[in-house]
């Protein structure tokens, strides 16, 4: 799994350069996933022809709450982007972030939207407030281990066909409760996230084996 995060607006040269890198990495059979924002159908086809397997495009929150966290585009635009990518044959990785001020109803609504999308992978992130950012002072008192477990269990129940993944926040909200976490999810992330450090590969493997589980590594 190789992930490349990029901006929402691309020039043809940028897509061509990315396609070239994808072709190179596919030489050893690596399963590739890119987190790349919005694409036109033509751009997506260029990446598909280069061998890209999966694209990450999170819903992030519910349809009703989305405008509270993003002003540059709409929730429906994200849904339509995902549908276009599915139509072209891409696997989809799509999930959300918990702890941005949304209600419990918003969490349920987001998961119901994801059930309609049926992504191959569904990552759940738990907010890690970063000072100086718009959510730097977010109230995360509700993000107890019990509540976070309920969210993951609900994802498992509502979207059973997806690979349920625990991403950002697992080292904080599940510290000492890793066995419970691993009993619910299919996979966890290691070695950090887009805006925060995380548990390294060796420590993550130790966490998994100490909890009595075996592991497979999806990485490049």
Please provide the spans of the model-predicted regions.
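Canonical radical SAM enzyme core domain
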Residues: 11-54, 59-63, 98-106
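Alpha-helix-loop-beta-strand connector modules within alpha/beta enzyme cores
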Residues: 12-36, 75-93, 139-161
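Auxiliary Fe-S-binding modules of radical SAM enzymes
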Residues: 115-220
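A short acidic, helix-capping loop that chelates divalent metal ions and anchors anionic groups
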Residues: 8, 63-69, 131-136
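Catalytic cores of alpha/beta
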Residues: 40-47, 101-113, 172-183
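Single conserved hydrophobic/aromatic residue that forms the stacking wall/gate
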Residues: 1-10
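Structural preference for beta-strand elements that scaffold enzyme active sites
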Residues: 31-33, 54-56, 91-93, 121, ...
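Active-site beta-loop-alpha junctions enriched in small/polar residues
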Residues: 7-8, 35-41, 60-62, 95-101, ...
């Amino acid at each position: 799994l190789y992930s490349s995060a990029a901006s929402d607006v691309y020039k043809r040269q940028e897509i061509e350069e990315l396609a070239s890198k994808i072709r190179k990495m596919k030489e050893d059979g690596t399963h590739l996933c890119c987190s790349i924002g919005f694409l036109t159908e033509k751009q997506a086809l260029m990446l598909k022809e280069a061998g890209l397997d999966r694209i990450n495009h999170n819903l992030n929150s519910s349809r009703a709450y989305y405008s509270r966290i993003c002003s540059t585009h709409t929730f429906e635009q994200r849904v339509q982007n995902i549908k276009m990518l599915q139509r072209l044959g891409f696997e989809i990785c799509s999930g959300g972030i918990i702890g941005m001020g949304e209600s419990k109803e918003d969490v349920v609504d987001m998961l119901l939207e994801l059930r309609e999308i049926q992504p191959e992978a569904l990552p759940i992130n738990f907010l890690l407030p970063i000072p100086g950012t718009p959510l730097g002072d977010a109230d995360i008192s509700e993000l107890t281990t019990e509540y976070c477990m309920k969210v993951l269990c609900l994802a498992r129940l509502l979207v059973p066909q997806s690979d349920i993944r625990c991403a950002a926040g697992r080292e904080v909200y599940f510290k000492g409760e890793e066995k419970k976490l691993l009993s619910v999810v299919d996979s966890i992330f290691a070695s950090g996230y887009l805006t925060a450090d995380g548990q390294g590969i060796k420590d993550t493997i130790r966490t998994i084996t100490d909890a009595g589980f075996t592991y497979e590594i999806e990485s490049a």
